[in-house]
Amino acid sequence: MLYLEYIVLAALVVFLSVRLSYYVDCLDKKTNLSGAFIGGVMLAAVTSLPELFTSLTAVLALDQPDLVQGNVLGSNIFNLCVIGGLMLFTSRRYQRATLSKSHSKTLWFGLFMYALVFAAIMMPKEVGFSFLKVNLMSILILLVYAVNVKFMGNDDSGDVEEEVYISLSVRRIAVRFICYSVGLVIVSILLTTVTDRLAEELQLGATVAGAIFLGVATSLPELSASVNLVRIGNFNASFGNIVGSNLFNFIILCFADVLFTQGSIYVNEPQVMNLLGFGAFSMVCTLVVIYGKKHRALVLLASVAILGSYVTSILLSM
């Protein structure tokens, strides 16, 4: 019964995220907002809602900070696997696609955030008041994210003008977008409690359970949305969704750090270090996918490396 609950909730996450990706594509075509901003900030934030609310539930209701690290870091590697997997099947179409320049900048910011999380674990430095203390690196992560959002908001280098008729008004699109977002939040909270029960039943560590069950399940929105966007030819928003979600996931650690008052959210464990190392490696490989866009063999090689990185990280974390 527990596994059935997990599957049903995961399926609901997929359905809701596919609908969200459709309305994001509608906004992309009906407004003057840059495609990089819509995919990398709006859609990224919405498809990261499961990571956000599952992590907050893990901290506030379940007292499981290890679930948060496994969820966020595991989700980040899985997200990049989506790009790797898509490239294996759509590399020829990808070579003809137009991408915003900000995507590579976002990945560089992401690598910097990995370094900040590593520093938070190895050299913990808390700032704040007696009743509210946060790791200094959490503040720096928020600042880095804010700078990246500014870059994305001004980047329209990947936008392509196309005449597409959409019958819905911007207002109706926005209302439906919000409704599906709320549904995604509710399902995400339920998914966290089921994952915690699965971890107990299978006697898995919280970090491993977070990386496998939460990391994969909460990445289903990114997977579904990105596959759907590539299917309709919007590679730019698809890439923005993945790399933007990865950056947004890092600030989830910051929120959890503020709310968890019984210790540090940044825990030094071998499983966490594995996820950090392979996550950073996957980001480097994704940069190769972007910079080597015209060289199909290089794109395919980097994509295989991303997929191999995820499998290896999970095996070493068991």
Q: Which residues fall in each region the model found?
A:
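Hydrophobic alpha-helical segments, chiefly the membrane-spanning helices
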Residues: 1-318
